[in-house]
């Protein structure tokens, strides 16, 4: 008698099984939708990561993209040279050849007329090449931590002949290295390992951060980008604040935020290529006076990594750290593969399916 189910009980059991099945299916669907936030201070490489996703998980840059980035390359190149020229006066550095002053005036005039996005005339290109070869300009470039200069300056200025050619078309690497300040929120969609990613890139400068809060619901994981190179630089928007100190403060507020109690945090210590060169001549103690280790890449990165990871106040939260070079497609492909595996495991655990 106890084993016989009434029609109503059988129907209730069927409904219960169906609900359980639906919940499991919903869990699987939820596990397949991934909302990723790219956060970090200004110029930490967030937008470059977005461009890499386009190369790795979409079809790369279209002919239209290349056309749109061409004036940006022209502008980034001449603006970088103009920034060095302006710093020559500020730092009191003399040109190796006095005749370079006329070339410098030509460059600054083009920038002030807002013609920096135009292809270079043969005269302008020659002036830029002569300037970049000048010993005074090179001395000033080597002191770039004392003023604001794009990371890509050397890359572009070393390629002046190619960029100034009449038939110039930006390469993938040229596009990856372009710098345009992100304003507002940029959303990118792609599919990888059967997951549907929605990646949100939000401007990192102080004025942009108030826009972050709109993105904070239902976040699967945060990728927090840090420019390793910021340890000896000050902010664009506040020249009294060290960039690394600002980034650490920001990481602390994100990592320990109540919104992100159950959110995976992935830390990208970025710009390792530039940092590797910079650390040889600019000591880490500029940012971390307590540091007593050698100014070698491995030890300096390990100390910086510890500074970030020790900000995590939750015993249950793990920080997944990667040392990255956002302009290196192979490196980002490898790292993003590892990041995705973390997300899959984390998601399935959350749904009770792992």
From Swiss-Prot:
A lipid is attached at residue 2 (N-myristoyl glycine). Pfam families: G-alpha (PF00503). Residues 197-206 are annotated as: G3 motif. GO terms for molecular function: corticotropin-releasing hormone receptor 1 binding; G protein-coupled serotonin receptor binding; G-protein beta/gamma-subunit complex binding; GTP binding; GTPase activity; metal ion binding; mu-type opioid receptor binding. It is an enzyme of class 3 (hydrolase). Residues 266-273 are annotated as: G4 motif. Residues 174-182 are annotated as: G2 motif. GO terms for biological process: adenylate cyclase-modulating G protein-coupled receptor signaling pathway; G protein-coupled dopamine receptor signaling pathway. Residues 35-48 are annotated as: G1 motif. Residues 32-354 form the G-alpha domain. Mg(2+) binds at residues 47, 182. It catalyses: GTP + H2O = GDP + phosphate + H(+). Belongs to the G-alpha family. G(i/o/t/z) subfamily. G proteins are composed of 3 units; alpha, beta and gamma. This is Guanine nucleotide-binding protein G(o) subunit alpha. It comes from Xenopus laevis. The gene is gna0.
């Amino acid at each position: 008698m106890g084993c016989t189910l009434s029609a109503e009980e059988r129907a209730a059991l069927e409904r219960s099984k169906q609900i359980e099945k639906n919940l499991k299916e919903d869990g699987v669907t939820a596990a397949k939708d991934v909302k990723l936030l790219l956060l970090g201070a200004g110029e930490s490489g967030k937008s470059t990561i977005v461009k890499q996703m386009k190369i790795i998980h979409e079809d790369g840059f279209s002919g239209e993209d290349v056309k749109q980035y061409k004036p940006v390359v022209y502008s980034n190149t001449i603006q970088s040279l103009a920034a060095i020229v302006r710093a020559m006066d500020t730092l009191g550095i003399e040109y190796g050849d006095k005749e370079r002053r006329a070339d410098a005036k030509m460059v600054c005039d083009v920038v002030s007329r807002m013609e920096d996005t135009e292809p270079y005339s043969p005269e302008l290109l020659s002036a830029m090449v002569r300037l970049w070869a000048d010993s005074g300009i090179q001395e000033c470039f080597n002191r770039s931590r004392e003023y604001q200069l794009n990371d890509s300056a050397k890359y572009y200025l070393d390629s002046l002949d190619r960029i100034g050619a009449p038939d110039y078309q930006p390469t993938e690497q040229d596009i990856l290295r372009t710098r345009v300040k992100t304003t507002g929120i940029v959303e990118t969609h792609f599919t990888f390992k059967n997951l549907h990613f929605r990646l949100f890139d939000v401007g990192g400068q102080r004025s942009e951060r108030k826009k972050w809060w709109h993105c904070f619901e239902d976040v699967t994981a945060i990728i927090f980008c840090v420019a390793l190179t910021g340890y000896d630089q000050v902010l664009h928007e506040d020249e009294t604040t060290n960039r690394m100190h600002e980034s650490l403060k920001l990481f602390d507020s994100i990592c320990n935020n109540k919104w992100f109690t159950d959110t995976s945090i992935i830390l990208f210590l970025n710009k390792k290529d530039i940092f590797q060169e910079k650390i040889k001549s600019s000591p880490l103690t500029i940012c971390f006076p307590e540091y007593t280790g050698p100014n070698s890449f491995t030890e300096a990165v390990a100390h910086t990594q510890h500074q970030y990871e020790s900000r995590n106040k939750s015993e249950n939260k793990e920080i997944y750290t990667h040392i990255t070079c956002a302009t290196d497609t192979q490196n980002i492909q490898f790292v993003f593969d590892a990041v995705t595996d973390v997300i899959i495991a984390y998601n399935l655990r959350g749904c009770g399916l792992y």
